[in-house]
Amino acid sequence: MAYSYTEKKRIRKDFSKLPDVMDVPYLLAIQLDSYREFLQAGVSKDKLRDVGLHAAFKSVFPIISYSGNAALEYVGYRLGEPAFDVKECVLRGVTFAVPLRVKVRLIIFDKESSNKAIKDIKEQEVYMGEIPLMTENGTFIVNGTERVIVSQLHRSPGVFFDHDRGKTHSSGKLLYSARIIPYRGSWLDFEFDPKDAVFVRIDRRRKLPASVLLRALGYSTEEVLDIFYDTNVFHVTEQGLSLELVPQRLRGEIAVFDIKDASGKVIVEQGRRITARHINQLEKAGIKELDVPLEYVLGRTSAKVIVHPSTGEIIAECNSELTQDLLVKIAKAQVVRIETLYTNDIDCGPFISDTLKIDSTTNQLEALVEIYRMMRPGEPPTKDAAETLFNNLFFSAERYDLSAVGRMKFNRRIGREEIEGAGVLSREDIVDVLKTLVDIRNGKGIVDDIDHLGNRRVRCVGEMAENQFRVGLVRVERAVKERLSMAESEGLMPQDLINAKPVAAAVKEFFGSSQLSQFMDQNNPLSEITHKRRVSALGPGGLTRERAGFEVRDVHPTHYGRVCPIETPEGPNIGLINSLAAYARTNQYGFLESPYRVVKEGQVTDEIVFLSAIEEADHVIAQASATLDENGRLIDELVAVRHLNEFTVKAPEDVTLMDVSPRQVVSVAASLIPFLEHDDANRALMGSNMQRQAVPTLRADKPLVGTGMERNVARDSGVCVVARRGGVIDSVDASRIVVRVNNDEVETGEAGVDIYNLTKYTRSNQNTCINQRPLVSKGDQVARGDIMADGPSTDMGELALGQNMRVAFMPWNGFNFEDSICLSERVVQEDRFTTIHIQELTCVARDTKLGPEEITADIPNVGEAALNKLDEAGIVYVGAEVMAGDILVGKVTPKGETQLTPEEKLLRAIFGEKASDVKDTSLRVPTGTKGTVIDVQVFTRDGVERDSRALAIERMQLDEIRKDLNEEFRIVEGATFERLRAALVGAVCEGGAGLKKGTEIDDGILDGLERGQWFKLRMADDALNEQLEKAQAYLADRRQLLDDKFEDKKRKLQQGDDLAPGVLKIVKVYLAIKRRIQPGDKMAGRHGNKGVVSVIMPVEDMPYDANGTPVDIVLNPLGVPSRMNVGQILETHLGLAAKGLGEKINRMLEEQRKVAELRQFLGEVYNEIGGRQKEDLDSLSDSEILDLASNLRGGVPMATPVFDGARETEIKAMLKLADLPESGQMRLFDGRTGNQFERPTTVGYMYMLKLNHLVDDKMHARSTGSYSLVTQQPLGGKAQFGGQRFGEMEVWALEAYGAAYTLQEMLTVKSDDVNGRTKMYKNIVDGDHRMEAGMPESFNVLIKEIRSLGIDIELETE
C-alpha cells in the first residue's frame, strides 16, 4: 500500500480483523453538497436542475398583473464575486456573500387585440440582494462570526395513518386517524370518534363529518356509498325475497334460518355460525340465489334510491334503514329489486354510512358553505367565496404543494404503482385516503410508525435556504403585482418594479437568527465536524422540547447505520438532537441512507448499495462481523441478521445484504473511542460529548491508543493544510508554504505555484487558539491530498485532543474521592496541559452629542507609568505583557459643561482648558485577566483621518501581499526559463543579444545573459522564435495579472471600513492568555470518566515503579466497576504496551543498532500480532525506516477500531513483546515513605483531555456591586458581578446552629437592607466594626404584594 507524506513518518499499528470495503466518505458532504445544489453556481443555463434558487424563482414567476395586461417573467440568474475573502470577512465583521443578479423580462400585452398580442418586451438584470456563500469547510461567515446551519429532521410530507393508543376514550378503544401533511399548505385530518363515525378537520380546526368534504368534492350520497361498499341484491318475488348469494360474504355470520341446497339438504342449521367449511360446501353446491325471510332484510340500509316503478315517486332515500313499514310499501309498489349495503361486524363496518346519516348537508353548495363557516367563522358565506376558499385549500398549486417527496410517500402508502404526480391533491387522492383509513379500521392494514426513519426526512441547509428565499419572493410578488398595472402606462423598467429588500431581509434573517443557524462550536476539530453533522428535530416546523415525548427521543431500529444511537446531549434535548452515523448520507428525497454490500446466494460481493430505511425493510442484512471464508462466502450455519427491523438468525442463502463496516452504526465522535464495545452506553455518550469540549493543548500529542478514525477527522475538518496539487516544496517558513506544482497537474493558463498562508494564533469562536504549524521541509515531494501543516489539536495529520498520561488506578490519601484526580507536578512543568486562550477586547470611539470621542495617549489624570505600553496613537504595542487594569487603548470622551466655582475658573485660566472637559473612558484589561498582546486591528470609517498605527498595520499587510505575489511570479518565471533553456540549448542563433550569427547556444551563454536578454535572441528555427515570443507575452500577462491583484488588495485595504452609524473608529486588541492546569480544572478520558483536579503533588511524592518512574496521574479504582466503562482499563493496558515498545525502539536507536534489526523488530510489532492488514515496511527506504523509528520513540501508536478492536490475547502478546508483565499490573512504591504498596497496581497510559470548564473562568468574588432594582438584593452570576445566594437551606443551617446574629446579618446588611449596608460600609471605613440591622427591602416588597391582593397591612411601631 502507498503511504502519504505523514503516514509513513508514523504508521499506526492496526488491530482490525475486517477488510475495509469502503472508505469513510467525506464527512462534510451533507453540508457542502446541499448548498451547492441550492446555488448551482457555474452551471450552464440549459443544465440548471429544478432545485434551489432556480426552483424558487420558477415557482413564483411569471407574475401577471391583476388586469392581465402585463407579465414579469424569469429568465435566469447569475452570482457575482464576493467583495472580500473569508479571512477578510472575519476580520472586518462582514458577511461572506455574493451579489445575486436576476434577469427578468417585462412583457406588456396589447389591450385592444383579442388574442393578447405582445406590445412591448423589456429585459433587464435586477439586483436581488446578497446570498451568503458557504466556506470550503461547510460554514457561513455572518457579520464576521462563523456559523453552522444544522440540518433538521422533520416529518416527511405524505399521508400517515395512526391511532390514539386508546388514550382519548375511557373505554380504551383505539380511535384511528389519517393525516395528509403537505410540504406547504393546509393539513387535512380524518379521524374516527368513539361512535365510529368519520370526521374531517382542516388545519386542526373544529371537526365536520367526513361526508361534508366528499360532498364538497362533488360526490352524491349514492356515489359515496358506491365507492365504499359492495351491495347485496334482493329480488322481490311472489314467494317472498331471494338474495343473490355471494358465499364469502356469509362468513362469520350466524344463520338465522336453515340454509339448504337445491335438493333440500341442510348445509347450515339455524343458529350455527357459518364457517369456511360451510362456505366451501355452498360454493360446491353452486347456489346462486337463496330464499330469505323478511326479517333478514329488516334493519339493513338501502344502497340506492327506491322508486315507485309506475309513478316515479321516491319510496325510500338512498342510505335509509329498511323498516317493516317501508318493506310493506315496497311490496305494494311491486318493486322487483332492492339493493342494500353489505356490512358486517368483522371486516366491513358501516362507518361511512353512519357518517352520512349524521351529516346535515345534502348537496355540494351546502357542503362548501359548511366548510367556509368552519374556516372563516363569522363571515357571511357567498357561493363564489366558498368555492374559491375550498379550491385554494388543496387544489391550487400556489397555496398547496405536496412536493416530490410528499407525492412519492403518498402514492406508496395508498398502494399506487407510480411515484410521480401532481403537487396538489385530487378527488381520487382524498377518497383513496379515506378508503385506506376505513380498511385499517376494518382490520385490514396497519398504522404507521412516525418515528420510523422512512417517515422522517432531513432538511439540509440548501433546502431551508430555498424555503426562506421563496418566502421573500412571495412578499416581493405581492408588491410587483400592484406595480405591474402602472408599468404599462408609465413605461417602467423591470428594476423599477422589483424591490429586493424583502428577499434580502428573509435571507438575512434565516442566516442571522434562525433557530438552526448556530454559532459554530469551534473548541477543536472534532467539535466543528460534529456540529456540521448534527441533525436536530427542533426548529421551525419541527418539535418543541416540551411536547416531545419518550417515543420521539428513543433509539429506533431504523437508526442503525443512519443516526448514532450514542451521541446525543444529556439534558432536555436528549434524543432530539442526533449525530449522523459515519457512513450515512441523504438521498434525493432527503431520507437517510446507509451503505450495504450485496450478497448473492451466500456469496458476499464488493458491490455497494445505499438504502433508505423503507427500502431496507424487506432485506435480510448480516452484520459486518459475520464469518467469511477466503472466497468471501458466509460459512456459519445460521447468521445473525436484521430483517423487518428485528434482530434474528437466518441461513446464509437467505441473506441479501451485509453491513459495510462495524463502525457504520456510530457517529464520528463515538468511533474515536477505543474499546467502545466494552463501555456502557451511558458512559460512551458522555465520552463522545466530552471529546468535543477538549481544549487544544500547547503541543498536540497523538493518542497512543486510537481507532484509526483520527486521520479522517483531522483531514476533513479543514484545520490542517492539505495539498491541493502535488509538487515540490519550494520554500517554507512558520507562516506560509510555497509549492512548485508538478507539471502534469498544471492546467493551461494556471500558475504552476500554490501558496498556502498559514493561520497564526487566531481566536476561535470559543476563545481557544487556532494555529497552524508546517510539517514539510524545503525540497520535500508532496502528493495531492497530503497534509502539509498541522492545525490545533492535530499531530502529524491525526486528531490529537489531549495527552498520553501515565496513570495508576489506586486510592491515594482520599485525594481521589468522588472521581477527583491527583496530578503530578511534572505535568505542569512539562506544560502538558497548558492551553492558550485568545480574548478579543474592543474599544469603540463614537460621535457623541457633546462631540467626538478621541483615541489618544493624552489621558487626563493618568500617570506616565500607566501609559508606558501605549504608542503615540494611544494603542498598546504588540508583545506587551499586560495585567488586570492596564490601559490597552487610551480614549477620552467629552463631558457636559458643569457650573464652575470661582476657584476652578481661576485654575482653568492659569493651567489651560484641556484637562477638565474630557473624561477617561479607556479600554482596560478586565479583572482576573493577564496576558500578552498578540495583535491589534484598527478600523476607521470613511472620511476620518487614519492614525499612525492604522497606517503601519496597512503597510505591513501590503508587504505580506507583495511578498506572496513576488514569490508566485519568481516560481512561474523560473519554470518558464527552465523550459526555454531546455529548448534553446544546442539550437543555432541568428544574432541578437550581442551574439554572432550561427552561434550554437549552450548553458554558459545563457548563464552569461540577463534573463531579459533571452527574448532578444533571434533563432534560426522559427518555432523557437515563436516560443520565445509566447513566453515573453505569457510572463508579461502574469506580471500584469499579479499587479492588478495587488492593486485590488491595496484598494480594499485603503478604503474606509463600513462601521455602524455613529462609530468613528474601532480598535480590537487580541490578548493571548496562557492557562496551566490547576486544581479545579475538569479533566476526562474518552470513556466518560470525568473528574476535577483535586491536588497537584510534587513528583517525589507520587507513587513510582521499580525503575523509579513516577506516575503522572492517580485515578480512583472505584470509578470503574459501577460505571461499567471497562474500555478505559483495556486502553490503559494497551497504552502501556505501546509505550513499552516505543522505549524498546528508543534503546535500539541509542545503541545504534543496524537498520535491518530495526526493520525486523518493526515487522514483529506491526505484522506478527493481531490485525489483518500487514504493513508494507519493505516499501520504505532505510532513511525512512530510521525516520519512522525516531518518531516511534514516544510509543508505537495503535488503532483498535470500534467493534473490531484488539482482543485480550493480543494485548497480552503486545505487553510480552514490550517485556512488560502480561497482567498490566506492577508493584508501586509510596513516594513519601519509599514503602512498597501491598498489592500490585494497574499502571499504564491513558489519553486524558482537559475540558473547557476551567476554574479561571468560574472563580469569582464580590465585595460590593450592583443590586437588583426591585428587591435591592445583589444580582447573581459572574457575568453580572453578582453575589452568592444565601438560600432557604442555608438559612435552615444557621437556624439549626442557633446563630441568630449571623443569620440577621446575612438577611439584612449583607443583602437588601439599603440604609444598613451603606451605614456599615461607612463604619468599616472609619474602623468601627459595629452593625445595625434595619428593614430588608424584600419585606417592603412582600407588603406591597399583599396589598395588591387587597389586604391592607401597616407596620406600626410601639
Swiss-Prot record:
SUPFAM superfamilies associated with the record: beta and beta-prime subunits of DNA dependent RNA-polymerase
Gene3D superfamilies referenced in this protein's UniProt entry, alphabetically: 2.40.50.100, 2.40.50.150, 3.90.1100.10, DNA-directed RNA polymerase, beta subunit, external 1 domain, DNA-directed RNA polymerase, subunit 2, domain 6, RNA polymerase alpha subunit dimerisation domain, RNA polymerase Rpb2, domain 2
Disulphide bridges: none
Keywords linked to the UniProt accession: DNA-directed RNA polymerase, Nucleotidyltransferase, Transcription, Transferase
Enzyme Commission number(s) from the entry: 2.7.7.6
Top enzyme class: transferase
CDD domains xref list: RNA_pol_B_RPB2
Catalytic activity: RNA(n) + a ribonucleoside 5'-triphosphate = RNA(n+1) + diphosphate
InterPro entries: DNA-dir_RNA_pol_bsu_ext_1_sf, DNA-dir_RNA_pol_bsu_external_1, DNA-dir_RNA_pol_su2, DNA-dir_RNAP_su2_dom, DNA-dir_RNAP_su2_hyb_sf, RNA_pol_bsu_bac, RNA_pol_bsu_CS, RNA_pol_bsu_protrusion
Coiled-coil boundaries: none
Single GO MF descriptor: ribonucleoside binding
Subunit structure: The RNAP catalytic core consists of 2 alpha, 1 beta, 1 beta' and 1 omega subunit. When a sigma factor is associated with the core the holoenzyme is formed, which can initiate transcription.
HAMAP family named in the record: RNApol_bact_RpoB
Known function: DNA-dependent RNA polymerase catalyzes the transcription of DNA into RNA using the four ribonucleoside triphosphates as substrates.
Protein name: DNA-directed RNA polymerase subunit beta
Protein source organism: Azotobacter vinelandii (strain DJ / ATCC BAA-1303)
Lineage: Bacteria, Pseudomonadati, Pseudomonadota, Gammaproteobacteria, Pseudomonadales
Gene: rpoB
